[in-house]
């Protein structure tokens, strides 16, 4: 067996180091995507530093790995850097960006750095409006089970690995491809996955859905002529663009014309069972440790990629069956005894109407007898404005709704696109009387009067609601007002 040190030495001969680059500085290092790329780079031996406005689990992990972490932004923090990597959330007036420009230090977006990592590897890039993180995690798990030892960069915590990024010793790199700013066009993978295409981040595409679709076509044409596009044919927009793709295409879905087709879907609580049919191969009866039809589609993408790479079926079966999930993707935080009775707490990152609808459907299918109580935090005023009617329709489908204020993500408020407006519009439908929660602290007094024994309490959104959900779990859903 080759020793670890020898394996890394072999890896360096395949993947050349970036010329002249010794120290890399990240601005906005605490984000999952930025932190994942940073973790791979620090493990490759680069000197790493980074800044963000607050500490979190990502910055703490990077600090343990030896990165220099600064809280707050200051011009002197880029001193000595050979390149500065910026997140899409960073404004051009940031003092570190201005200082880098003054010093003629190259400034690159995170996707450009990811592309550099992928340049000499066998890249698998996962794009789409929804399901990227879960699909990327499933592919990484299958490749790990098959002992392919991949490098991966994921937008969420892969529970089995305890991290969202890892430097492997093979030629494989599996990563999410971010369409939010069209920066996924920097990537040149060997395999590209498109899970679905819906209207989101439309400011990037000047409000033009045709431009968004064309950008996905361009992304798939970044594949070499011997590359493979793996596409969900159940999605109508993906199906629509397929005739424009001049590369080999493998389709997946529940549709009869899918190359990798799911049959006999059945949800059993947190897990899903289904049969996979592939042309010229034996059917596979599978269980994936994830709930919902949408997660079966994510699993099909992983199966399609693995099958194309001739990974044995046994590794696919084991990886899906033993999958331990991803942080904040229908993550069950526990069942707690409250004064009202037993309450199950689940946390989910979904923040687009289609994602919220899929989460609600999975909850209803897996736990049909439970009342569904949702605490929802809208993410970005622009998204709330652009998809307002869709949000009103989907949020009205729960049994009890508590709406936190919009998590702005740095955006200025948009009149008529806030949580108070959503409450009014949902109430006018006559199905539900939502509760507006101006400050998260108010949940201490509101929840005891809302929860009932047997409820499924779902915290939903992409802002800081994940931290709130963990606080609720840490407190065991016990509230100060109950003990007074």
Curated annotation (Swiss-Prot):
Recorded metabolic or biological pathway in which this protein acts: Cell wall biogenesis; peptidoglycan biosynthesis
Binding site for ATP: 128-134
GO molecular function, one term: UDP-N-acetylmuramate-L-alanine ligase activity
Superkingdom of the organism of origin: Bacteria
EC number in record: 6.3.2.8
Primary location group: cytoplasm
GO CC entries: cytoplasm
Keyword Cell division part of the UniProt annotation: yes
Alphabetized Gene3D superfamilies for the sequence: Mur ligase, C-terminal domain (3.90.190.20), Mur-like, catalytic domain (3.40.1190.10), NAD(P)-binding Rossmann-like Domain (3.40.50.720)
One BP annotation, GO: regulation of cell shape
NCBIfam families, per database record: murC
Family (UniProt): Belongs to the MurCDEF family.
UniProt function note: Cell wall formation.
Protein name in the entry: UDP-N-acetylmuramate--L-alanine ligase
The species this protein was found in: Shewanella loihica (strain ATCC BAA-1088 / PV-4)
Biological classification of the source: Bacteria, Pseudomonadati, Pseudomonadota, Gammaproteobacteria, Alteromonadales
């Amino acid at each position: 067996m080759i020793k670890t040190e020898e394996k890394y030495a072999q890896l360096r001969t395949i993947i050349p180091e970036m010329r002249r680059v010794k120290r890399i500085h990240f601005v906005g290092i605490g984000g999952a995507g930025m932190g994942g790329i940073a973790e791979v780079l620090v493990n490759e031996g680069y000197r790493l530093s980074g800044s963000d406005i607050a500490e979190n689990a990502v910055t703490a992990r990077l600090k343990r790995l030896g990165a220099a972490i600064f809280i707050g932004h200051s011009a002197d923090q880029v001193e000595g850097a050979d390149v500065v990597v910026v997140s899409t959330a960073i404004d051009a007036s940031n003092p570190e960006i201005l200082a880098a420009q003054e010093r003629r230090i190259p400034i690159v977006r995170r996707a450009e750095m990811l592309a550099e990592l992928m340049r000499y590897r066998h890249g698998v890039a996962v794009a789409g409006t929804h399901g990227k993180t879960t699909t990327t995690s499933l592919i990484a798990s299958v490749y790990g089970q098959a002992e392919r030892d991949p490098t991966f960069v994921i937008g969420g915590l892969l529970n089995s690995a305890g991290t969202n990024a890892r430097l492997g010793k093979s030629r494989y790199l599996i990563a999410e491809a971010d369409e939010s700013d069209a920066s996924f066009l920097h990537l040149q993978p060997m395999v590209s996955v498109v899970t679905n295409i819906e209207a989101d981040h439309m400011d990037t595409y000047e409000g033009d859905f045709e431009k968004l679709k064309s950008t996905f076509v361009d992304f798939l044409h970044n594949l070499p002529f011997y590359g493979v596009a793996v596409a969900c044919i159940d999605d109508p927009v993906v199906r629509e663009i397929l005739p424009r793709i001049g590369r080999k295409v493998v389709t997946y879905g529940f549709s009869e014309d899918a190359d990798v087709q799911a049959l006999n879907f059945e949800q059993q609580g947190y897990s899903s069972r289904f049969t996979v049919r592939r042309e010229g191969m034996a059917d596979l009866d599978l269980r994936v440790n994830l709930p919902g039809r949408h997660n079966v589609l994510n699993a099909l993408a992983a199966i399609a990629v693995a099958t194309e790479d001739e990974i044995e079926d046994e590794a696919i079966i084991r990886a899906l069956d033993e999958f331990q999930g991803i942080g904040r993707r229908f993550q069950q935080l526990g069942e707690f005894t409250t004064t009202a009775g037993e309450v199950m707490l689940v946390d989910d990152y979904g923040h687009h109407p289609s994602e919220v609808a899929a989460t609600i459907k999975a909850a209803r299918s897996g736990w049909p007898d439970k009342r569904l109580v949702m605490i929802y935090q809208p993410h970005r005023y622009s998204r709330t404005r652009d998809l307002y009617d869709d949000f009103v329709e989907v949020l009205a489908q729960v049994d009890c709704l508590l709406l936190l204020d919009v998590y702005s993500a740095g955006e200025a408020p948009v009149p008529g696109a806030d949580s108070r407006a959503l409450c009014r519009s949902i109430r006018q439908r006559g199905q539900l009387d939502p509760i507006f929660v101006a400050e998260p602290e108010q949940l201490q007094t509101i929840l005891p009067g809302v929860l009932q024994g047997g409820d499924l309490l779902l915290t939903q959104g992409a802002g800081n609601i994940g931290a709130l959900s963990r606080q609720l779990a840490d407190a065991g859903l016990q509230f100060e007002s109950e003990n007074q």
